[in-house]
Amino acid sequence: MRVLRNFTIFFLFTALSLFRQISASAGDLHPVYVSCVNRCIENKCHGNPSDTSKLPLDLKLFRWDCGSNCGYECEITAENYFAAHNLPSQQYHGKWYFIRVFGIQELFSVFFSMLNFMIHYNGYHIMRRCIPDEHPAKRLCLSWAIVGMNAWVWSSVFHIRDTPITEKLDYFSAGAFVLFGSYCTLILMLRLDQLPGGKLLCWIIGVIFIAAFIAHVSYLSFYSFDYGYNMKANVAVGLVQNILWYYYSWSNRNSGLYWTRWPAYIVTSLMLATSLELFDFSPIANLIDAHALWHLSTVPITHYLYGFVVRKCSYDLTKGTFKIKAYDSSR
């Protein structure tokens, strides 16, 4: 349990450090950047930053306008200034400068987000094929994969083009995935649906989770888009989920089944992957940063997640954990 305590502390430290990084942004406050943007809007946009008439097709396609394009071009100007004066690169509105490719802001983050979508898509079909229809949690597991696919779709969209709308859709979808993952973990690990009155209990917990998500989204949408609150909410829910996964591995440590250790390995790997954000650095070749590498690292982790779910659900049936008709393992 000491290992669990240490990794819990590490997880909290890493997550809170991420919030400090998100909040800090010196580049867009630098006089070189500010004066450049003002001149660009005045001279190129003729005072109308929403104009798109002179932009190439790829920028129009991804909803760039003259003002946002000025911001991008002035990031280049500011970065050249910093390099000429031996100053470190800076972040702009919470992000590093990236080379834009055909209107796409963060090419590798988009690509790695799409890889994550594919691994969830593949996981969906593996579970659909390998989890027996008799398992009462099969639909829940499939829904988990669908929520995951949705989250990575909006992650891809957000990294293609960062706007207030795509940012909210990315954050809200990620929050839904974390919350729904915690709900699924409660059901799968603790088998709440097999308790007396378990179906009602699961329904009540589901309603509470849905109400919490609606309240969370409403607060961020209509009151204040508070990055700190959003981070803390996701950390709290994620921490509960991680503890449950660790508990499952610990409680089955003497089972003799190698795959019961996977939840602990998965959570530990996820925490280590998240630490990439803690050691943030300016993008390599202005294309790949720590955030992109974090997206890449979650691909193999998710693969093992679905592998574990399939094994556990099959084991539940063969060992009679669920009170249903006998499962024919030869199918």
Swiss-Prot record:
State what protein this is by name: Protein PER1 homolog
State the family named in the UniProt similarity comment for this chain.
Belongs to the PGAP3/PER1 family.
Which keywords are on file for this protein?
A: Endoplasmic reticulum, GPI-anchor biosynthesis, Membrane, Signal, Transmembrane, Transmembrane helix, Vacuole
InterPro entries tied to this protein = Per1-like
Q: Per its record, what are the GO molecular function terms? A: hydrolase activity, acting on ester bonds
Any idea what job this protein has? Involved in the lipid remodeling steps of GPI-anchor maturation. Lipid remodeling steps consist in the generation of 2 saturated fatty chains at the sn-2 position of GPI-anchors proteins. Required for phospholipase A2 activity that removes an acyl-chain at the sn-2 position of GPI-anchors during the remodeling of GPI. Required for efficient transport of GPI-anchor proteins.
Subcellular locations according to the entry: Endoplasmic reticulum membrane; Vacuole membrane
Signal peptide feature range: 1-24
Side of membrane Cytoplasmic, spans: 122-139, 190-199, 251-263, 311-331
Keyword Plastid on entry = no
Q: Which residues lie on this side of the membrane: Lumenal?
A: 25-100, 161-168, 221-232, 285-289
- Write out the transmembrane intervals: 101-121, 140-160, 169-189, 200-220, 233-250, 264-284, 290-310
- What is the taxonomic lineage of the source species? Eukaryota, Fungi, Dikarya, Ascomycota, Taphrinomycotina
Primary residence: endoplasmic reticulum
Q: Name one GO cellular component term.
A: fungal-type vacuole membrane
Q: Name one GO biological process term.
A: GPI anchor biosynthetic process
Protein topology in the membrane: Multi-pass membrane protein
Q: Which Pfam families does this entry report, sorted A to Z?
A: Per1
Q: Can the keyword Membrane be found in this entry's annotation?
A: yes
